[in-house]
């Protein structure tokens, strides 16, 4: 266990005051290892809140550089960061918030060749991506490696999320396979309200913190959806499918798959 310094006790004092956290819980967070895939709309609030919370080891994967159109929702980046790799921009802000955090960057695309190698050292994975192929890749790699992860998806005014633990419903239990390329509009085509990314990203961050603290009920075996226009939140119960291609009784997928690109992630209704 880590012995907190006086400065750390002050920094995390509002956590430590919580009966469900305390010194022991904060020490758990300082030992935690979280990988964030995507340093964009969802990854931004997740990275900021996990760093502020004192999650001791955070990895972040993204091959892109900061673009002007990102700044409407990707709040970890600033105008001065234009053209900078997103992972480096994110690392700078995370360390500025909390120098206790160790940040590992992967300036690369996640694909079938590197996904398991990148994910393997981490305890919890945040899916902050904006395309179906990588979402299925993250799911399949995490299931194969026995890793917990939080799925998140946003489009227009809507968001959805769930959490997977080994033995609970996975992404393929909800959605069997990616839609055909081009069947779902991209965020650049359909748009997204910037604040939606913050709403969903902070939920994902809370799920990660709850996981390490062992507090409350995680969003397992249920999909949380919301519509910011109406502010209606609902949860849909989904059972693990015995016939699931990756986590079922007789899995048929025995390797990772690079699907054809089909960006954004909410089903088009």
Regions found by a protein language model. Give the residues of each.
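Adenine nucleotide-associated cytosolic modules
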Residues: 1-269
